[in-house]
């Protein structure tokens, strides 16, 4: 609620004092001031600060995303590496079932996907749509990540999502991935 201010005639009224559209909810303020925003923006110094202040590296925000989800999605390798070394759970799932590997795979961050796999991330986990990280990489045509995931777990290409689709069924038109995923 806006703070009352004095009108020109001296009476007290309740006019909004904030600029319309420039308000933040408490939830948004928590995000901006927390480890999630630092990870999203690749601010390793702030992420280290939060961890040194005993912030749980796997603490989820209101949507279930952890700092590792945000760093993975945005390609911040050093932040991902630090979070994993600080005990972040690589397979934490959002309310929609996404893992950091899902996010890195969808966004095309091959080296982060490799890092997550080297820390034990499970490529067999599915989101609420039944999609694996391979589905997410294929959907966006990320050949390097598809190859990486199949080197790690070749049988992933036989996994069907909740709509009975294989990863190869999600390939963009004219994708060179057909041979890799459909064979």
UniProtKB/Swiss-Prot annotation:
ANK repeats lie at residues 30-59, 63-92, 96-125, 129-158. Disulfide bonds: none annotated. InterPro entries: Ankyrin_rpt, Ankyrin_rpt-contain_sf. The keyword Phosphoprotein applies. SMART domains: ANK (SM00248). Keywords: ANK repeat, Phosphoprotein, Repeat. The modification Phosphoserine is found at residue 153. It comes from the Eukaryota. SUPFAM superfamilies: Ankyrin repeat (SSF48403). Pfam families: Ank_2, Ank_4. PROSITE patterns: ANK_REP_REGION, ANK_REPEAT. Belongs to the ANKRD39 family. This is Ankyrin repeat domain-containing protein 39. It comes from Mus musculus. The gene is Ankrd39.
